[in-house]
């Protein structure tokens, strides 16, 4: 018989840097999950990813206080900021441009995020990433 799901917890945790401090500790503590067990498992699973990149994670907590979790790819905005070499996007994206990204960089980001995105082809995923870039005040070079 399948375990009864008690809750789903969605967090963004830095790759390889999960620890019991907020936001991880309070979110999992409320559900009665062993926090250190999650931290060790998460850090082990994300050790191949660049340390410090925020990784969205969905934790499924069961009634017996056991858990499973699924890691996603880093947000597109974070990958775009890294590719453009900027700290943050523009406050006025239509007026103030803060950086540039090339089609090759957008293709690379789309391929990285392919598993978590909708869209039939890599080209449609690239258009989505390019739209995110424009909304951040980045110029998309052809």
Swiss-Prot record:
It comes from the Bacteria. PROSITE patterns: RIBOSOMAL_L11 (PS00359). GO terms for cellular component: cytosolic large ribosomal subunit. One or more lysine residues are methylated. SUPFAM superfamilies: Ribosomal L11/L12e N-terminal domain (SSF54747), Ribosomal protein L11, C-terminal domain (SSF46906). The keyword Transcription regulation does not apply. One of its GO terms (molecular function) is structural constituent of ribosome. One of its GO terms (biological process) is translation. Keywords: Methylation, Ribonucleoprotein, Ribosomal protein, RNA-binding, rRNA-binding. InterPro entries: Ribosomal_uL11 (IPR000911), Ribosomal_uL11_bac-typ (IPR006519), Ribosomal_uL11_C (IPR020783), Ribosomal_uL11_C_sf (IPR036769), Ribosomal_uL11_N (IPR020784), Ribosomal_uL11_N_sf (IPR036796). Transmembrane segments: none annotated. Belongs to the universal ribosomal protein uL11 family. PANTHER family: 60S RIBOSOMAL PROTEIN L12, LARGE RIBOSOMAL SUBUNIT PROTEIN UL11M. Forms part of the ribosomal stalk which helps the ribosome interact with GTP-bound translation factors. Part of the ribosomal stalk of the 50S ribosomal subunit. Interacts with L10 and the large rRNA to form the base of the stalk. L10 forms an elongated spine to which L12 dimers bind in a sequential fashion forming a multimeric L10(L12)X complex. This is Large ribosomal subunit protein uL11. It comes from Actinobacillus succinogenes (strain ATCC 55618 / DSM 22257 / CCUG 43843 / 130Z).
